[in-house]
Amino acid sequence: MIEIFNPAELERAKVSGRFIATVLQSLQERAKVGTNLLEINQWAGEMITDAGAHSCYVDYAPSFGRGPFGHFICTSVNDAVLHGMPHDYALKNGDLLTLDLAASLHGIVADAAVSFIVGASSNPSDSKMIETTQRALEAGIAAANPGARIGDISHAIGSVLAAAGYPINTEFGGHGVGSTMHQDPHIPNTGRPGRGYRLRTGMLLAIEPWVMADTADLVTDPDGWTLRSATGTRTAHSEHTIAITDDGPVILTI
């Protein structure tokens, strides 16, 4: 399903996007050395509930997961890159933490992710990975103009990731959003320009480049959700929800 939103609905989407951005910023500021991942999940749940929003994750039960996710936010640490299930773990100095949050406010979903170092980092490769995913996200967003194709976004993202020397996994990537969290079209993190679905004004897209330091292969934790790099190396992930408008892409989750 691909939904097309009118101008009034896009204004509601902006409110949803700003909410997600505010929650993620608050959680990033509160995530310190010693903070437990379960505390972060609790804080996210409190902010979602207080705003009258609806979590997209608590009841989320796709075919690739093991039952409902059951938490409000994904917390991926170090070699975990996607769908990190909050658990009893206290953050350590130098941990690379990714927070990925999706919620519906006023009936429209926004989805965003941010990676950052907890405390002080002694590993320049972490900073490079994070910065590379941010640049890839910027490139993908810049390519998301009305009339462009999904392949144009994918190619822009993949060009940045490949130039930095990172292998690219295409199993998981960006996606449409709207009244639900995961909609068509799928947006791989590499692709051929001029291919795929043509972008239309009124579409909402979640664009999310992610990388693992030296592999494109994933392994799944016993929890049935958390995806890690197959080699145990570190990972990074950046994501924004955008609207396609007549004037070009507009980032909603800021």
Name each model-derived stretch.
Residues M1-I254:
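Active-site neighborhoods and metal-handling regions in enzymes and metal-associated proteins
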